[in-house]
């Protein structure tokens, strides 16, 4: 979700939008958008 696995930038922007410092695609086949815990 949120751009993963193909568009990690979309995931990063989603995380920024919820006041995290960013995010990345993680999990099985990188299909999960994971936000950094800051």
Swiss-Prot record:
Signal peptide start-end: none
Cited Gene3D superfamilies: Knottin, scorpion toxin-like
Transmembrane segments: none
InterPro entries hit by this protein: Defensin_invertebrate/fungal, Scorpion_toxin-like_sf
Principal localisation: secreted
GO biological process: defense response to bacterium
GO cellular component: a single term: extracellular region
Keywords: Antibiotic, Antimicrobial, Defensin, Disulfide bond, Secreted
Subcellular location: Secreted
SUPFAM superfamilies for the chain: Scorpion toxin-like (SSF57095)
Cystine pairs: 4-25, 11-33, 15-35
Pfam families linked: Defensin_2
Domains (record comment): Has the structural arrangement of an alpha-helix connected to a beta-sheet by disulfide bonds (CSalpha/beta).
Assigned protein family: Belongs to the invertebrate defensin family. Type 2 subfamily.
Functional description taken from the UniProt entry: Dual-function peptide with antimicrobial and potassium channel-blocking activities. Shows inhibitory activity against Gram-positive bacteria such as M.luteus, S.aureus, B.subtilis, and M.luteus as well as methicillin-resistant S.aureus (MIC=0.1-20 uM). Does not act on bacteria by disrupting membranes. Also moderately inhibits Kv1.1/KCNA1, Kv1.2/KCNA2, and Kv1.3/KCNA3 potassium channels. Inhibits potassium channels by interacting with the pore region. Does not show hemolytic activity.
Name of the protein in question: 4 kDa defensin
């Amino acid at each position: 979700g949120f751009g993963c696995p193909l568009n990690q930038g979309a995931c990063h922007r989603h995380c920024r939008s919820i006041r995290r410092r960013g995010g990345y695609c993680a999990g099985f086949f990188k299909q999960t958008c994971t936000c950094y815990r800051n």
